[in-house]
Amino acid sequence: MKLADKKADRGFVAKGDEINYAKRSNDELIDLLKSRIAIERTIGARLLGSRGVVSVEYLLMALKTEKKLYPRLEICCSLARIGEPSIDGLIQLLGVIGNNQHQTPSEEPFLKVSYPLPRDLAARTIIRIGHAALPVLCGVLNEDHPAKISEAIDAIGFICSKGGADQYLKTLMACYNKFKNNDLLRWKLFRAMSSFTESLTFLEKHLSVENNPAILQEIKRSIRIINKNKR
């Protein structure tokens, strides 16, 4: 199979190729989103991004079941483009889609200075909406659903790494106190604290008591990033 055919099979549509469908009604675009043809699903998802809140429910349903790369990417782009009306639905999908999420602390060091992109698809979409999602994400940390909390922490850490959200450190601290015996959440929380200069003392305190090598490595990384950002 030629490269172009492979991309078409995965639903690739070049920018601008959707123009012939632009005047279709919302219902017609929703039907495209349900098509058996991946290219049509991509077109439907792309155009629904400009139709606002009425599209959110259908895009979220499609995101749960879509297996092809390009329609899935376009669904995420449209949900992010619609913005705040997408947040609550995406929150419900944290930790639900796919199996790419971390299940244990990674022993592979993350060497970049930038905050790592979430591996969870819903979290990765939420971070594109930005600071508006933080209050709802922090609400997740009060739940008793570790898999969902795990992905919310990634999104909070990423968004807060861009600055202007120092008030959310207290929420992360409270989450730490609640889940400090959960290795995965502890690892992710120490990573998220790299986004907050005020967490330095807390991180340094745990540097001497943490005994999990992967988590200890993450504490050191967060301390290093904070000290670099303070210069």
Roles of regions detected by a PLM:
Residues 1-21, 38-53, 61-62, 70-85, ...:
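Structural detector for internal amphipathic alpha-helices that build alpha-solenoid repeat scaffolds
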Residues 20-34, 52-65, 84-106, 131-142, ...:
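Amphipathic alpha-helical scaffolding segments comprising HEAT/armadillo-like alpha-solenoid repeats
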Residues 212-213:
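Acidic interaction surfaces
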